[in-house]
Amino acid sequence: MNSHRGGIGAGLGLLLLAGHAMAASGEPDYRFKGKISRNVLENYLSRSITMTELYRSPGNLEDDLRMLKNIGAKFVGRAIYLWGGEARIADPQFLAQGREMVSRIHRNDPDVVVQAAAFEIVTEGIGKVPVPGWVFREFGQKPESRNFDYAKMLFPDKKMVDHWRRGSSVPDICQVETKMWFFFLAASYMNIGIEAIHFGQLDLMGRNDRQYRNWADLLKHVRGYAARKARRKFLICDAHVPRAGPVVDGRLLLDFHSFPLRPKEVADSPQKAVLAVGYSDALYGRSNGGTTPSGWRCEHLPYLVEFDNFGGTRAPGQSSQARGPSIFTWGFDEITWFAWQPEGYRNEWLHYAWNWLKEHDRNGFLQMPGGRMLTNGPPSAEAGGGRIRWYFANAKSAACPQGFSQEETIKAIWDEDTRK
């Protein structure tokens, strides 16, 4: 297997400077079509930011787009998705909003990859969404006039049924109906210009697919559609990988891996946290390798780590790790813990995490927090005396009064990285 950095084809007229694939112009290279090289992929991951549900921005879309342009973002994560409420995709407005968002981002910078997500949830409301004929044909079935069938997506042993709440379950990837749904979602997103999809908790949906054969089958269909219809004839696929990433017969199923940051509390410094190889189920140093969907080989697939959101404990602000590893940090999920910190420490911590990854695992990249929901967020006068429900990296201003002001720090980190 190759070492971390692979060679670059001279025919593309590229240079490798400071770990970045550079075009002949001297700018980082973001060109791909039909497949993506490791260096171009890493250029994107190194300029990645989470912008949850940007298509219907909970803040100010104009200011969000301004921020993305200002900082030079190249990979805009989780910009459109469904968490339940599947009937929305049957409403033309949903995809129209998504298409307009993608178009506006590309007017500012056509190189940007905009990511959607297909998560580990289906609800009874999925029965309101018609199955198109082309989805039946993709899976070798005769088209019929019907809607997606919630019951056909569930685990036969009833595990994970009503997992999220009554009528809201984790789908079983081994079921053809589940594959049809995810294929339909992926194709619908590609049709509006989406070029990457995060497939959520892949192992949760694949608890009966330990060899990943069903995931491989789904992704074969998705990649086939991308080769015909996607903006650059390729879809960049990832998922959360607690088992370090799916490999089938030596071939990686995903283009990069993703996982939460898993901050470790500093026991004698309340609210402080660090990163550590080997802590809990953190991905550092253990991302699986193999042959990628684009054909290059690696010992460890590049990956993103993100400030995840998943709830909190009954003791917010108190240690969650005193008795051992926990996914919670000082009683909060990761993005909520981050939001509770003073502005100076938030900025310091972004520098710290960026540099820590460079030192401890150069296969890993920090996905900057741009926009994400909070659980039990900090109180704020701007929230009408209540708690802030959303983290915005935007500089605090009249356009974004609840901005947490990491915008210029993110820009400075990326600018410094470009100069190296």
What residue spans do the PLM features occupy?
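Bacterial N-terminal signal peptides that target proteins for export
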Residues: M1-A10
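Bacterial N-terminal signal peptides
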Residues: A10-G19
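N-terminal processing/targeting junctions
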Residues: A21-A23
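Glycan-processing catalytic domains of CAZymes
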Residues: S25-K420
